[in-house]
Amino acid sequence: MPNGVLEMRLVVTAPDYGAALAFYRDVLGMREIGAFSSPGGHVTILDAGRATLEIGDPGQAAYIDEVEVGRRVAGHVRVALQVGDAAAATDAAVAAGAELLAPPTETPWRSLNSRLEGPAGLQLTLFEELGPAS
């Protein structure tokens, strides 16, 4: 591939499109950058900032679940979103209908991470980078 990957899109089929759109756009603050419709449906593209693809083995996934939640809960895909204030973002997400799996918890890698079950069946980690230990 001469130019490499230029953009990553995580494409999610949401049975309740309106609720999922409102949650990710209005509650988590993802900016709408495109919207399209067909005779049978709709799609909206939201800007989630810089995207990375994190690939881990089952042992690492189990370790992260243990640190963030205390037990194995994630499926094959988990979406991690960096936010400026993990506690406030978690509260807003829960108020908007996300299920809290674990409250914001400081991790060994110096981030404050919460775990939620969000709309459209996406398990979410909301994380805030804390910076170096003082």
What residue spans do the PLM features occupy?
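Vicinal oxygen chelate
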Residues: 1-9, 31-80, 90-117, 129-134
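Short, contiguous alpha-helical
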Residues: 119-126
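Conserved active-site tyrosine of GNAT-family acetyltransferases
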Residues: 20-25, 93, 121
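A conserved hydrophobic helix/loop-capping motif in glycosyltransferases and polysaccharide synthases
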Residues: 11-13
